[in-house]
Amino acid sequence: MVHQCVRQFGQKLVHRRGEDTIKESDGLKIHLSAIELVFLGVGRNLGAGLYIVVGAVAKYVAGPAIVICFLVAGLSSLLSRLCYVEFDARVPRSSSAYVCSYVTMGQLWAFIVGWNIILLFLIATACTARAWMYAFDSLIGDLISQALERTVPLHMPYFLATYADIFALGLVLLLAVLLALGVPESARVYRVFTGINILVLSFTIVSGFIKGDLHNWKLTNRDYTLTTAVFTYSLGPPGAGGFVPFDFEWVVQGAATCFYAFVGFAAITTTGKVVTPQRSISLFSLLMCFLAYFAVSAALTLTVPYYQIHHYSPLPEAFLHVGWGPARYVVAVGVLCALMSSLLGDMFPMSRLICTMAEDGLLFRALAKVCGHKEIPVMAIMSSGSLAGIMALLFEFSDIANLMAVASLLAYSMVSFSVLVLRYQPDQNLSKNEKMEEETEMEPVVEGSLLESEPEAGISNILKSLWFPTSTIPTWKSGQIVSGCAFLLVLLLTILSRILAQWPSQVFSGDPGLTTVAVLLLFITGVMVIIWRQPQSPSPLTFRVPALPVLPLVSIFLNIYLMMQMTSGTWALFGVWNVIGE
């Protein structure tokens, strides 16, 4: 009885959703064109990451080398997107990472992916709402923060924010109501905000390079000493000066934080299907966002010494630093519009994902309720908006930004892993008889005097199948070999990332760290070759990731390595969230 219950439970965990059960819009009507989806992705990316994270990372973590941070984070995002495009091509009727996971990998895998993407959107909404209030408060002389610190202090340092930001809560609820009124109306507002953002951003980049000074990339401790004699407000740490004032370890940590800036493509992949190929939309928005981040971070650090950058309002205060006072207000308006469009870009796809998961029974069924002829998921919008608003009310931006990076990196790593495994799996229509035949082939035949040689024959057949597959197309046996090797590779890459993240100086200084890394690389190469030797599926796809299995494994390694830069507190919060989901 117990065995049967356990077996049924296990079958539910690996149960796959039939592709024929997917509706064209997966339960909700789509009113967004391809251009609107590009606006959604660009507007979501060019938000808090551009106007808040850039200043904080440049001032405290990387200095002018923040451009390298965005290069590393952008590379990781590019590899993840390429893997997602193939993942999406396997389920042509849906563009949601959650639905694709449900169809191809099973219920448990889909829930983990979907639950972490929901966390990503919740935190992104809370962070952006806080960032909007920071920018607005800075524009009016910090009047709001000073008033809230006096009236609603929280008195829980290291856990909660200094004060409860009731204005951030109100902003999230207001936008939730706007979304509940209908997607076309909110999309129109979204285009206006994003257009203003792009215009102001272009002005900021051009002005920054005009007023920039290359000396700010070659600062010394003497420059810092002279600055402290003139300015009385809080300065950032000077480091060693130069283009990379802090160690390489800090640059990598900055790259992990900067990944926050590239999580917006989940907004596109969760929203819906359009005529334009998903690959074009996703990669075009990534290119635009990377160029914007690279240009803004370069212009900012050229205009202002990195240790003088304002933490919460870096771009408007940069114009004040160079004597362009009126331009500060123009840029501030653009910042507010950008953050507003980013908020809408987070809340819209979050409600769609919640509604879809509720329809599948993985969340409360009430959240799947839609209203009106437009089928707007009002319950999902208002419940997620309320939860995100509470997070914005209680937590500081810096406390939860890294948590969002962990959630997105894990979700994208799972997509890359899925692409690696699925490429080597047999057709889903493989008969049970063929599977049983392959299992029988793996079992050695027992015949009297040959009993003693049975283990050797079995091991020999298994080893031979690792290097010399018996079929030119994937079989059940070759698929199982790839799955096992892929899990082993993830374990080895995790150990390697941990060593490189925790003891980088010991690794490059000699033994025993260097020896350990060399052995790990040898094992990783060997297992990777085993996967490479297995037959790939000939099924036609609109896009196939090149250089398999190398590219997905590099993507997984970069994502894991960036995750290893996070603090123990971030991992504790992440664990609590996943325990709640279970």
What are these regions (language model features)?
Residues M1-E582:
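Alpha-helical transmembrane bundle of multi-pass secondary transport proteins
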